[in-house]
Amino acid sequence: SQPKSMEAAAKYIAGNFSDMGYAVTMQPVSGGNVKKGAAIYNILVYKPGLYSNNQSIVVGANYDSSGRRNNGSGTALLLETARGLKDIPTNHNIYFVAYANGAEPAGKSISSGACVHAGTLSGSIGATNILGMINLEPQKLDAGGERKQPGPEASREAVLFTTTPHGKKFAGQCAAPFAKSWEQAPTTFYREPSALTGNDRHYAVLGIPTVSCRSKYPVTDARTEEYVQALTDMIHQIADNDAPEPAKNAGQGEKAS
């Protein structure tokens, strides 16, 4: 995560968003994996919903890298889902965010780009207006050998969702459209917010429902295109859901603490 490569990556991502026709905001992030005095940024895109309120979905991925496992490739998924949804109206607002300082060791700290964004957005629109945060985890960069056709078992285990007990309902809302498109339900794991290690952690600790999506297929695999489509369909559906009014839904629509 050297500043020069981070700056080049930020410029590349911002340029891609701009080319799609989005207005781009650069949110400063400091410390963490970056040398003192270097300027790095979260790259934010806001897609307004049809409803004139603050209810929003956050879709994010970090663009810095800390090795093979956390390689920043989630940003490619972020860009492709943003591209796929550019001209599709949704009821709720969507924030697409490419995070700086998402890789270890800064990823768990207050200098994480996700921590900066979660705190700022919840402060401006209120955490309860963030209906959920979807974290797009990086994929392996290569197959690491001969490509094998995955059997039924491999396919079942190929996509993993991680959520929190509080995010169970949101994860279910995400899994349904994803499974319809992917033709296979993701395997879902539950973790306490403090046990999360990704960008989602910083939203979950604020009581925001989260789901982190991970594909075991490498970036170069033919199924990655289908994975992108399933994610796009999922985000579209989630951002289009009608949120029930708490008053009409006593006991179920209560704000969780």
Regions found by a protein language model. Give the residues of each.
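Second-shell loop/turn segments in exported
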Residues: 1-7, 30-34, 62-71, 84, ...
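Active-site-adjacent substrate-binding region
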Residues: 139-254
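Extracytoplasmic/secreted proteins, especially bacterial periplasmic and envelope-associated proteins
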Residues: 4-24, 73-80, 112-116, 120, ...
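Loop/turn elements at helix/coil->beta-strand transitions in domains of secreted/extracellular proteins
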Residues: 20-22, 53-57, 90-95, 126-132, ...
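Active-site-proximal beta-strand/loop segments in catalytic clefts of secreted hydrolases
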Residues: 27-29, 47-49, 60-64, 97-102, ...
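A non-catalytic alpha/beta surface segment that caps or lines the substrate-entry region
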Residues: 1-48
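Acidic/histidine-rich catalytic neighborhood of metal-dependent amide-processing enzymes
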Residues: 65-169
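Surface-exposed patches in mature extracellular/periplasmic domains of secreted proteins
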Residues: 2-6, 22-30, 89-94, 185-194, ...
